[in-house]
Amino acid sequence: MARITEAEVRHVAGLARLAITDEEVTHFTEQLTKILEFAEQLDELDTTGVEPTTHALDLKNVLRKDEVRPSLPREEVERMAPDWENGQVRVPAVFE
């Protein structure tokens, strides 16, 4: 039987930068345990002869040729950008 611990719920919440209460930790622990137990039922299925699949639907990417289209002049982009460095728009860091 799959069981997720409160420590694991707190860890995942921390990774997601979520502040959760003790009550929420208990609630999510119970919910996630039920979800894992439900998913374990798939182990009981006989999948002999069933081809592995990566997608539920047989979709294909539709590719097209690249085409050059008019865009803003570089000078206008530079004028509008809050920060510009070495010919590129400088943005705040996403990762620490």
Curated annotation (Swiss-Prot):
Keywords in alphabetical order: ATP-binding, Ligase, Nucleotide-binding, Protein biosynthesis
Mention any Pfam family matching this sequence. GatC
Domain of life of the organism in this record?
Answer: Bacteria
Q: What is its EC number?
A: 6.3.5.-
The record's section on Gene3D superfamilies has: Glu-tRNAGln amidotransferase C subunit, N-terminal domain
As its record notes, the protein acts as a catalyst of: L-glutamyl-tRNA(Gln) + L-glutamine + ATP + H2O = L-glutaminyl-tRNA(Gln) + L-glutamate + ADP + phosphate + H(+); L-aspartyl-tRNA(Asn) + L-glutamine + ATP + H2O = L-asparaginyl-tRNA(Asn) + L-glutamate + ADP + phosphate + 2 H(+)
Assembly, per entry: Heterotrimer of A, B and C subunits.
Q: Which family does it belong to?
A: Belongs to the GatC family.
PANTHER family with a match to the protein in the record: GLUTAMYL-TRNA(GLN) AMIDOTRANSFERASE SUBUNIT C, MITOCHONDRIAL
Q: What does this protein do?
A: Allows the formation of correctly charged Asn-tRNA(Asn) or Gln-tRNA(Gln) through the transamidation of misacylated Asp-tRNA(Asn) or Glu-tRNA(Gln) in organisms which lack either or both of asparaginyl-tRNA or glutaminyl-tRNA synthetases. The reaction takes place in the presence of glutamine and ATP through an activated phospho-Asp-tRNA(Asn) or phospho-Glu-tRNA(Gln).
Q: What is this protein called?
A: Aspartyl/glutamyl-tRNA(Asn/Gln) amidotransferase subunit C
Q: Which organism is it from?
A: Exiguobacterium sp. (strain ATCC BAA-1283 / AT1b)
